[in-house]
Amino acid sequence: MEGSATVHMAAPAEKIWDLIADIRNTGRFSPETFEAEWLDGATGPALGARFRGHVRRNEIGPVYWTVCKVTACERPREFGFAVMAGGRSVNNWHYRLAPAGDGTDVTESFRLTPSVLTTVYYWAFGGWLRKRRNIRDMTKTLQRIKDVVEAD
């Protein structure tokens, strides 16, 4: 399962990337992840850096922590991370920034790591509904980022 959303922002890619890649800002923008913090002494974005996010699933619960690992970190073009479980990636989130007209097109995407578990989840537990929810929430996240970068 995968999906994406794109929003145009009238701001330079560097400004947007700096806001996105500082995961401590996540709670300002994400409908579900209300806080995040770097782990293992990391103080900022770097390939392989780990962080954890505090998630309130579907904005109502359950509430849990996820450990994530930065998988793409190229200022000002892309930032990505994998949500880890038992040392394995289960979900991948990615931001791609591309110059466009008076600003930057920002695309946020997710892709569940293919496995028996994700296949069962998709077909038996309404995973397609989660895809719709993720796309809606990515659009909301990007709109909130847009509001901040265009207000400055």
Predicted regions and their residues:
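Hydrophobic ligand-binding cavity/cleft-lining segments
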Residues: 1-43, 144
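Generic structural detector for well-ordered beta-strands
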Residues: 6-10, 37, 54, 69, ...
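Exposed loop/turn and edge beta-strand positions of beta-sandwich/beta-sheet ligand-binding modules
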Residues: 3, 64, 91
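Glycine-rich portal/gate segments that line the openings of hydrophobic small-molecule binding cavities
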Residues: 37-88, 100-105, 139-152
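Beta-strand/loop substructures that line and gate deep hydrophobic ligand-binding cavities in soluble
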Residues: 83-140, 145
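Amphipathic alpha-helical protein-protein interaction surfaces
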Residues: 12, 22-25, 75, 102, ...
